[in-house]
């Protein structure tokens, strides 16, 4: 069985399990949205999934109620919890707040959503992230640069490098990629 067939089989099994097991369904909501959005926007599933793992991966799955406030991660218990924490952070003057499965930054991208609650919706969150990553790929002509820019702006090379290396490590850990000589050299 080829690696590609194995991945499809695993993703199919995950989708089947998610549709038949309510406990898994809530835990795998981000992953299901990733499979759909990756196909819609022509993004290799492994890349979008590895970006998600880098952003909110915890205990083997992505977290729809994750947030990051000014560099400090918080994993909420539900949407009400996260929205309350969001409101508290904004009242304290926090500007850099990332929300949801793919950690969409409210300050830079919030205008594309009707509300912070909408940003936490796994479908909207992952869909927006996939479209954004696809646009970055078109602009920068490589997935590596798209991933780098997803996390940090053009003037933050150290953060971009660290992030790209974390995404590559997640690609390798999940079986979607392997360490190439160039990647190994780059991530030293």
Task: Give the label of every model feature segment.
Residues 11-20:
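Bacterial N-terminal signal peptides
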Residues 2-12:
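Bacterial N-terminal signal peptides that target proteins for export
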Residues 26-188:
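Catalytic glycan-binding domains that act on GlcNAc-containing polysaccharides
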């Amino acid at each position: 069985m080829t690696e590609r067939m194995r991945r499809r089989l695993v993703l199919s099994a995950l989708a089947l399990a998610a549709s038949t097991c309510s406990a898994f369904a809530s835990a795998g909501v981000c992953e299901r949205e990733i499979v759909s959005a990756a196909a819609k926007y022509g993004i290799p599933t492994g890349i979008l999934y590895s970006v998600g793992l880098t952003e909110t991966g915890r205990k083997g799955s992505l977290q729809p109620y994750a947030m990051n406030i000014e560099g400090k991660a918080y994993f909420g218990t539900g949407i009400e919890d996260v929205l309350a924490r969001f409101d508290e952070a904004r009242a304290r003057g926090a500007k850099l707040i990332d929300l949801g499965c793919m950690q969409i930054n409210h300050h830079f991208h919030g205008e594309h959503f009707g509300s912070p609650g909408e940003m936490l919706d796994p479908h909207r969150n992952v869909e927006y992230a996939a479209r954004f990553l696809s646009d970055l790929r078109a602009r920068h002509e490589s997935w590596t640069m798209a991933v780098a820019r997803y996390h940090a702006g053009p003037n933050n090379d150290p953060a971009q490098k660290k992030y790209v290396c974390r995404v590559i490590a997640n690609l390798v850990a999940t079986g979607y990629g392997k360490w190439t000589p160039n990647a190994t050299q780059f991530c030293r």
